Amino acid sequence: MGIQGLLPQLKPIQNPVSLRRYEGEVLAIDGYAWLHRAACSCAYELAMGKPTDKYLQFFIKRFSLLKTFKVEPYLVFDGDAIPVKKSTESKRRDKRKENKAIAERLWACGEKKNAMDYFQKCVDITPEMAKCIICYCKLNGIRYIVAPFEADSQMVYLEQKNIVQGIISEDSDLLVFGCRRLITKLNDYGECLEICRDNFIKLPKKFPLGSLTNEEIITMVCLSGCDYTNGIPKVGLITAMKLVRRFNTIERIILSIQREGKLMIPDTYINEYEAAVLAFQFQRVFCPIRKKIVSLNEIPLYLKDTESKRKRLYACIGFVIHRETQKKQIVHFDDDIDHHLHLKIAQGDLNPYDFHQPLANREHKLQLASKSNIEFGKTNTTNSEAKVKPIESFFQKMTKLDHNPKVANNIHSLRQAEDKLTMAIKRRKLSNANVVQETLKDTRSKFFNKPSMTVVENFKEKGDSIQDFKEDTNSQSLEEPVSESQLSTQIPSSFITTNLEDDDNLSEEVSEVVSDIEEDRKNSEGKTIGNEIYNTDDDGDGDTSEDYSETAESRVPTSSTTSFPGSSQRSISGCTKVLQKFRYSSSFSGVNANRQPLFPRHVNQKSRGMVYVNQNRDDDCDDNDGKNQITQRPSLRKSLIGARSQRIVIDMKSVDERKSFNSSPILHEESKKRDIETTKSSQARPAVRSISLLSQFVYKGK
């Protein structure tokens, strides 16, 4: 699209400007250039024929940008393809089909990212998409026009007539058509590049475009290649510039190339060149002022002298609609052109490719196609009058059965049997209303062993009224025992069900055990020895490991019989001595002031073994000779007995003597003798079972 390499050569005269420079002016906009740019955001939807409005949103955003800078847009859309550009259009069409096939294949394989690149290359901008933008322009009062052929020549014509003051486009062909001010590279911030034709003289000597005439510029472009001709192979803009400046005309340039023999000139190049020159200079456009088809520039008379020249000229600049034939063809005279139809095409009412069809909005067309997929068939014209069916014919009717005596007799007998059955049911329900109804309900479950029977009696048998029935039931509830099934099955949490029978004997045994524990505790307190080991409870109870089993047995809850009101035979066994463990000691029963309760041990609290060390210091080391200093240290491991602990008293005198044996060998021997004497004098006592790490200490007797 455009002339390859032309804009980079014009970089020295590209002026970065803002749209504020064109405040209050009208700028022509290449609509298809914006559509190509907007199609990148919805390439998949456009290629697959799905509805989308993303390209319309692009235009709306650009219109708001121009409105911000107080610039009035004038949209120009492409029309029908010009005959000179048919070869280029066919190549582009084939390329789009190839890219679409590649995109669909990649999309099916899961390569969606690569497929999107090919979808963007295969998008075809259609007049239906332009119609969507035209509808928006009509609603918002934005000026637009559909060119009969190329939008480039149409925009240049608007600029020549001073209808617009500049052209916004990405196509460099506009400079060849004669554009005076081209605005390119417009971004979302209103920043763009301006190229003015008046600045061509400022270009460097390497590319002196300002020294060439308009015809020579067209020749240079045709040599390097453009949309209308492929040019000569291996000839670029700089080479073409040199050839034009040296030989001026195309005939002399071709002769020089043929003479040198370095370049190959295609056979069709001369015809392509002549058609391109005519299309660049005299292409047909639509004049919005006169509302008729005109040429871009005035056609000179020498091009219309002969019939062959006229044919050649009008075939290159575009076919128009003939007034009489209503077909697009070569028309020599302006009076034979149907300007009214071209006006409708310019307004966007008719399709530029097929002016017999109205131009439809793409999105509306797809929405209608998706909502109604009805195939209309041709009506049958053979019948003169169509049969009109009444509305009842569309509903299903019930057909009447023919009278058959056998079927009638069978139906009559069935009805009689049904009537007899219903009458029997009614009699059974209504008769014997005052008879006692007994319903047996088996209430056997996993909680009860005996099945029970509930009797349902009629109210009238027990009394004449409901009040009499209430009085009878209240009196019976006090006299008659309640059945076992009607008793409450919930037992209070304070009662613990047991199967013990001899409650009195058990309570006596518990009291005896408790009194024995109290006596053992007193005896253990009276026989306290400073250097012995004895087991005590955390609360001060001096029971042994053998007594622990007895106390455990004493904690077994006792049972007693309790009866609920209204139950005569039902008895619930429970523990009436739950608080037996909180009773006072029997040894202090005579004295009320000195009675001490036996505190129970908490279930979740576990005591740790404590070590009490009795250390006798030497006379030389401390003034407090003979005084006992007791230190308390927690043991490292717990006792095997659940909530019990051990108290260990150790004579540390031997330990202190062992520490000083390293001072001299004499003291070492004395300490050994002293240890031997102490071990002989001490009496061995078996230690209580313990897993404490302090069990390695030697226990000493008195």
Swiss-Prot record:
Record text on activity regulation: Inactivated by calcium and zinc ions.
Superkingdom assignment: Eukaryota
Residues reported to bind Mg(2+) 2: D171, D173, D227
Keywords of this entry: DNA damage, DNA excision, DNA repair, DNA-binding, Excision nuclease, Exonuclease, Hydrolase, Magnesium, Metal-binding, Nuclease, Nucleus, Phosphoprotein
Chief location of this protein within or outside the cell: nucleus
Disulfide-linked positions: none
Oligomer and partners: Interacts with mismatch repair protein MSH2.
Protein name per its UniProtKB record: Exodeoxyribonuclease 1
UniProt gene name: EXO1
